[in-house]
Design a protein with these regions (language model features):
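Preference for short coil/turn "hinge" residues that link or interrupt alpha-helices
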Residues: 10-13, 67, 108, 154
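N-terminal export and membrane-targeting signals
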Residues: 14-20, 80-86
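Membrane-embedded alpha-helical segments of integral membrane proteins
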Residues: 16-74
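Cytosolic juxtamembrane N-terminal segments of multi-pass membrane proteins
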Residues: 1-17
């Protein structure tokens, strides 16, 4: 092994397999970045964009296999290139870590893409329905009873939000949270007489790939109080890997917190002053 750091070793040729392993890893990174840009900016339809992405992951796997072959060759003939192999392995590990995590999530979570607080009467996609016309896009119609049952098992805490505020106030709080999240609002209708039903339709993007996921929110009166129902659905793919459930659960939490924080602090009633004790003169 000492020979590998000696002067004669430095004159040895670099393994071509090691060079190929490194170059494939670099190409995979470039292809992944290009595929993300294609999806985010809509340069191509979804299928070509995904083909680019999975092709990049395939290059990363091929880079690992070539790197292993290069390692065996270097061990046998003493050529150089270990640094290139290690660089390729590092790049590939970073590149494949998140897809590997998503693969595990795919096995753990139910294959559903449409989450709602009210499976019996989910908020409808009206303005958003026109945006679901691309090839491979999911239907704007709710996924149905199978999805509802899978949701009930996997995410039992996702339920209608009941608020002790009027519908107009619930609408304002919800719209402010949607705006704060930088979701693209497609349509908004505040509660109006006689039915006093408010609606918000918006589009969110997944953090890395920027896949579009559609959200419809309905605010309905409940006497002097209000109920908020939320629906979040992936525009593409049969499984959302839990992203819609996480979005709905977080929005529910933030709506409740915003309404609770806006309530005036209730002052504790002061106890009446006690009358001075009577003294009996003796």
């Amino acid at each position: 092994m000492a020979r590998r750091f000696s002067a004669p070793y430095q004159s040895e040729p670099v393994s071509s397999l090691a060079t190929w392993s490194r170059n494939l890893a670099i190409f995979a990174v470039v292809a992944v970045v290009v595929s993300i840009l294609i999806v985010r900016f809509g340069f191509l339809e979804m299928k070509p964009a995904l083909a680019t992405f999975f092709g990049a992951l395939g290059c990363a796997v091929l880079s690992i296999l070539v790197g292993l072959a290069a390692f065996a060759a270097i061990w046998q003939n003493g050529s150089r290139g270990m640094g290139r192999i290690l660089l390729a392995f590092l790049i590939n590990a970073i590149l494949l870590a998140y897809p590997a995590y998503l693969a595990l999530q795919y096995r753990k979570l139910p294959p559903i893409h449409d989450i709602t607080t009210d499976p019996i009467d989910p908020p409808r996609f009206e303005a958003l329905a026109r945006l679901r016309s691309g090839e491979g896009a999911n239907s704007a119609v709710y996924a149905g009873l199978y999805s509802a049952e899978q949701q009930r098992i996997a995410y039992p805490d996702i339920e209608t939000v009941e608020l002790e505020v009027p519908p107009q106030r619930a609408y304002e709080v919800t719209l402010a949270l949607v705006t704060k999240r930088k979701w693209l609002v497609i349509d908004e209708r505040p509660p109006q007489l006689p039915r006093r039903i408010g609606r918000i339709e918006a589009v969110a993007r997944t953090p890395i790939m920027g896949f579009r996921e559609d959200i419809s929110i309905r605010i309905t009166p409940d006497g002097e109080e209000s109920r908020v129902d939320i629906r979040s659905s992936s525009r593409y793919f049969e499984s959302d890997l839990g992203s819609n459930a996480a979005r709905v659960a977080k929005l529910i939490e933030d709506i409740n917190s915003a309404v609770d924080n806006a309530k005036p602090a209730q002052k504790k009633p002061q106890a009446p002053a006690k009358a001075p004790a009577k003294t009996v003169k003796k």
